[in-house]
Structures are given as structure tokens and as C-alpha cells.
Amino acid sequence: MTEPAIKAMIQLMDDSDQEVVHMVETQIRTLGPSIIPILESEWENLSLNPVLQNKIENLIHEFQMESMKTRLMHWKQSGAMDLLEGMWILATYRFPEYSFATLKKDMDQLYYEVWPQMRDNLHPIDQIKVLNGVMFDQLKFGANTKNFHAANNSFINVVLESKKGNPISLCVIYMWVAQKLGMPVYGVNLPNLFVLTHKQNGLQFYINVFNKGLIFNKIDIDNYIAQLNLTPNEIYYNPCSNLEIIRRVIRNLMMAYEKAGEQDYKDELNELIDLLD
């Protein structure tokens, strides 16, 4: 369909006949996300028609959601190997123009900040201390305790810019840098608190990134689980998958939107959970 024809259909979305509006919107939906640039262009030209602007916004969001679902499903079916890609896909939920290339560039820059200070002969705990020094003392990453439940804490682009996040977003950034440096650092799905573990050759310890990289051990997890009156489970001690991490990020977002009274966003995110189950 030609661009003029699409623009004519967009104008018909403002028709007084609701049957015409329904038919036109249905037809536009069949065209798919490729027409988003045309929709955006028309939106800019309709400042005096907020009702039609709102309809266009809803269509754009539907198309963006469709694209996001497709990317997320492809990511899962491809083995969910690249955690950074999964985090980028989630970020495009609210920041559709955000590119993976931009995310990769920003993450690489973090790596280059740490790499010159790392030494091959360092003990694993000392390696973590070096990483902590750069991430928390030099670069000033830290916990967003003032707005702990804010949705932006789960969007990696916002966390990289503000340097404030929740446990899982900070852990993802920290873990990616650590793994790029060759460290066997992985995520651990503790209840109410996402942490990391360094696990290799019989040596295992844990890292609380939300508390400036505090190092702790299995006994501390035992005590934590006991305080929560939970039965010990292997998942509280061992690495989890990238898929589990992305699921948890989505659930955090759902909770954030529920607390903010944004039920529509929560319902949409629940569709993503269904895709990944």
C-alpha cells in the first residue's frame, strides 16, 4: 500500500461512523510495524486533533509491542544466550528508539574502565574488590533506595545513565563486566534479593551488588533463608539462567506498574511472562 493511501486511512480513523473507524483500524493493523514512521509523521501534523493523535499513539504502541514480542520470542528460541540482548529488548518496551548498539557501546566502556586495573594473578576475591572499587567508588553506581519500586530501575539504559538501580539491574551490569573480564560470576535467584555468585574449582562465594559488592558466603544465605522461614532450595545457592533473570526483571516491572496504578502496563508485561514460560 502506498504512503498516500495509508495517510488517507489514518484520517478516516477520525470518521464519525464507528463502523468505518473499526474497519480502517483493522486494515491498518494488518500493515504491521513497518508503517510506524508514517504514523509518527502523521501524529506530528495533528496537534490540533488530540483525539486522533491518541488513536495513533495506541496503534504505534501496539506495533511496538508486537515487534518486542517477536524479538523476545526469537531470543528465547535461540537459547537466550545473550543476557544483554534480553535486557535491551525489555528496555525497548518504554524506549523503542533505544538501540542495541548504543547499549553495547556503553557496556564496553564500563569494561574498559575496569580492565586496566585488573591483574591475572589476583585472587578471585581481590578481583572482585578491584571491580567494586571501579563500579562503586570511581563510577558511583549504587542502589536506588529512594525510589526502589520505580519502573526505571529495571530499564538498563536508565540505570546506566543514572547509575542507580535495583538489585537485579545492578547485578546484570556488574555480572556482564565481570564475565567479559573472564570471571565465573553468575546470577542467583534469592527471594526478595537478587545476588551474584563467583563459582569455580571448588571455590564459591557470593556478591551483594545492591550493597556495593559486599562479599558473603553460604552460611549467610542459610541465615537469610531461615529468617524468611523458607525451606532451603538449591536455586537459592546456585547460578540461574538468563531466561530466569529476564523473567524476574519483568516481574519487577509488573510490580512497579501495579504500585503506580498502571494496570494496562502490568497486563501487557504479563503477556511477556506467558511468552517466556
What is the predicted role of each segment?
Residues M1-D277:
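A structural boundary/capping signal
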